[in-house]
């Protein structure tokens, strides 16, 4: 899978039997640091593409991690489908497909980092797949409550026939009928369903909340942590952050540093974040961000030409 001649991000395509494809980006560990035991898989939050996590991938690779990112099907980004057909189950199946692809390519140790809505998906599958550890950031635990906060109305209380055609979620049109139907059919919507999914969790787990997050209640994340019988989990707060971890450079850098420390700690079987990291140069983070935006634009243009 690795291409040592690549200058920066390596682009992969997972082709599915139904003709759809999932785009995957690979970032190799920097050559001047010892390579870590685990490959990091990043699941982006809702309405976030994998190139939005270029900085985090740079931090992790600078500290010796092999990093994988992907765009879900029927989501923003480079994979197949339209966001108005996105459901939580499609997000789940996209994640499982990438995990299977990594396994098929000989990657045996995976640490999963999931943000926001993707964290709810991670909680759903964490006991069903082989992971070394899990890290979540501003992870959704009560989907219905988060949707009500984000949309400023509890649309899940309405009969399916009375839903508007689309829900405007962070500037994107989410198909209401298909999304809500899936939420109820597969029990995505409640805090209790999340607690049931993580019951018996045994792998190391670190959760980050944001102290100014109006979409996720810290008390419910604490309830999630408390419901896990294992002592191998810990909760940290990103001070000064809202649910939008990229709202400014100070918040963003704190997010990168904290998650990188968590990954390094968990790679060594620890939960304590009192750990030193190698800080990539600001110019390097900026450079890779610009390069990945160009790569994204090039791929989008190629896809348009093929359409």
Curated annotation (Swiss-Prot):
This is Acyl transferase. The keyword Transferase applies. The keyword Iron-sulfur does not apply. Acyl transferase is part of the fatty acid reductase system required for aldehyde biosynthesis; it produces fatty acids for the luminescent reaction. One of its GO terms (molecular function) is acyltransferase activity, transferring groups other than amino-acyl groups. Signal peptide: none annotated. The gene is luxD. HAMAP family: LuxD. InterPro entries: AB_hydrolase_fold (IPR029058), LuxD (IPR003157). Gene3D superfamilies: alpha/beta hydrolase (3.40.50.1820). Pathway: Lipid metabolism; fatty acid reduction for biolumincescence. Belongs to the LuxD family. The active site is at 116 (charge relay system), 213 (charge relay system), 243 (charge relay system). Keywords: Acyltransferase, Luminescence, Transferase. It holds the Pfam family Acyl_transf_2. Its EC number is 2.3.1.-. GO terms for biological process: bioluminescence; fatty acid metabolic process.
């Amino acid at each position: 899978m690795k291409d040592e001649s690549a200058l920066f991000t390596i682009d992969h395509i997972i082709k599915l039997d139904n003709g759809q494809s999932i785009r995957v980006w690979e970032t190799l560990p920097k050559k001047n640091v010892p390579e870590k035991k685990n490959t990091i898989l990043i699941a982006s939050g809702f309405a976030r593409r994998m190139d939005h996590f270029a900085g985090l991938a740079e931090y992790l690779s600078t500290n010796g991690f092999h990093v994988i990112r992907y765009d879900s099907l029927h989501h923003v980004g480079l994979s197949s489908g339209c966001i108005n057909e996105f459901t939580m189950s499609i997000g789940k199946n996209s994640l499982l497909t990438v995990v299977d692809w990594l396994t098929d390519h000989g990657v045996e140790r995976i640490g999963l980092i999931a943000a926001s809505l993707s964290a709810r998906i991670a909680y759903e599958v964490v006991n069903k797949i082989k992971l070394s550890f899990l890290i979540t950031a501003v992870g959704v635990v009560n989907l219905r409550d988060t949707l009500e906060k984000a949309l400023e109305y509890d649309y899940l209380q309405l009969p399916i026939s009375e839903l508007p055609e689309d829900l405007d979620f962070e500037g994107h049109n989410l198909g209401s009928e298909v999304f809500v139907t899936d939420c109820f059919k597969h029990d995505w919507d409640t805090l209790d369903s999340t607690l049931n999914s993580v019951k018996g969790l045994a792998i190391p787990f670190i959760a980050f909340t944001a102290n100014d997050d109006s979409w996720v209640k810290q008390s419910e994340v604490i309830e999630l942590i408390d419901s896990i019988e294992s002592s191998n989990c810990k909760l940290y707060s990103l001070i000064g952050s809202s649910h939008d971890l990229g709202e400014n450079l100070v918040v963003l850098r704190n997010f990168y540093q904290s998650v990188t420390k968590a990954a390094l700690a968990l790679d060594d079987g620890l939960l304590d974040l009192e750990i030193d990291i190698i800080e990539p140069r600001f110019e390097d983070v900026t450079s890779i961000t610009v390069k990945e935006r160009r790569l994204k634009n090039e791929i989008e243009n190629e896809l348009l030409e093929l359409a």
